Amino acid sequence: MGAMSPWHWAIVALVVVILFGSKKLPDAARGLGRSLRIFKSEVKEMQNDNSTPAPTAQQSAPAELPVADTTTAPVTPPAPVQPQPQHTEPKSA
């Protein structure tokens, strides 16, 4: 009941083609393939890094970074805004 039959896959493929168009699908598939290759190579590199022990005897302490000046100039509050007098014209009777 939960398995996808071939008809379900055909309908899904048709909906994808309708939504994205046939011109964008090859580019999307190519980009996905490149991303997967990069991901696999990074995973393999991480596994190789974990298998080779890091040199522990010659670890250097991280260099001390200069501290940036964090003082700020005092901020003066803006002057209060005075309400403008409203000019009303006398109503003619």
Curated annotation (Swiss-Prot):
GO terms for biological process: protein transport by the Tat complex. It is found in: Cell membrane. Residues 44-93 are annotated as: Disordered. The Tat system comprises two distinct complexes: a TatABC complex, containing multiple copies of TatA, TatB and TatC subunits, and a separate TatA complex, containing only TatA subunits. Substrates initially bind to the TatABC complex, which probably triggers association of the separate TatA complex to form the active translocon. Its main location: membrane. This is Sec-independent protein translocase protein TatA. Residues 51-74 have a biased composition (Low complexity). Gene3D superfamilies: 1.20.5.3310. GO terms for molecular function: protein transmembrane transporter activity. GO terms for cellular component: TAT protein transport complex. It comes from Rhodococcus opacus (strain B4). It holds the Pfam family TatA_B_E. It comes from the Bacteria.
